[in-house]
């Protein structure tokens, strides 16, 4: 993990919020692959295009805005001969089934359970 140079990093790899987007896309891809046969869906290729809005001024304490993403958008790309309506219904299933998406949509209770000094 890294951060851009203007945030003190070297910009050599993805930052944690980019990893969050990757986790969402990877989870959706796994759901698509795992459940396609049960939905009688075939595709040659599948990928997710993701982007999100994040104001770094919140993280930096420069503005009273949320520290994390305000919105995440994604497009599911199928290379398939299936009808568009069938793929749209399957995309909705993927969106509703993905555990990472569920965490982002419904929130997760984060609990600091202690501090350890090693």
Model-assigned labels for residue ranges:
Residues 1-22, 33-118:
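Extended beta-strand/beta-hairpin segments
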